[in-house]
């Protein structure tokens, strides 16, 4: 079930404040956040946000296509190392 349209998108207030400060100062340093649940707003375009994935902060450069998605979608939490290779049995 999706979020109600009348409520609007959710974004952590602390993240919004950090974005406003970064835009006012024309700062290009990544903004560190643990808020994976925050929706990407149009104000975030052009900024780099370091999203926590449980171990480290993954830098995510926000583009126009990302608006409306959640920050957590772009910082993967699980590392896929591949499936085990098939062991071929040779007859003697």
From Swiss-Prot:
InterPro entries for the chain = Ribosomal_uS19, Ribosomal_uS19_bac-type, Ribosomal_uS19_CS, Ribosomal_uS19_SF
Entry keyword set: Ribonucleoprotein, Ribosomal protein, RNA-binding, rRNA-binding
> Example GO biological process term?
ribosomal small subunit assembly
Cited Gene3D superfamilies:
30s Ribosomal Protein S19, Chain A
The yes or no answer to whether the keyword Cell membrane is present is no
Q: Name one GO cellular component term.
A: small ribosomal subunit
Do you know which PROSITE patterns this protein is assigned to?
RIBOSOMAL_S19 (PS00323)
Residue pairs linked by disulfide bridges in the UniProt entry: none
Record-level Gene Ontology MF annotations: rRNA binding; structural constituent of ribosome
Q: What does this protein do?
A: Protein S19 forms a complex with S13 that binds strongly to the 16S ribosomal RNA.
Q: Which family, according to UniProt?
A: Belongs to the universal ribosomal protein uS19 family.
Q: Which HAMAP family match?
A: Ribosomal_uS19 (MF_00531)
Name of this chain's protein:
Small ribosomal subunit protein uS19
Q: Which organism is it from?
A: Polynucleobacter necessarius subsp. necessarius (strain STIR1)
């Amino acid at each position: 079930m999706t979020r109600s349209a009348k409520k609007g998108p959710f974004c952590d207030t602390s993240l919004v404040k950090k974005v406003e400060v970064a835009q006012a100062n024309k700062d290009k340093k990544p903004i560190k956040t643990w808020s994976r649940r925050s929706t990407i707003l149009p104000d975030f375009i052009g900024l780099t946000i370091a999203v926590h994935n449980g171990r480290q902060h993954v830098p995510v450069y926000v583009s126009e296509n990302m608006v409306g998605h959640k920050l957590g979608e772009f910082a993967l939490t699980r590392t896929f190392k591949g499936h085990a290779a098939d062991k071929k049995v040779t007859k003697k």
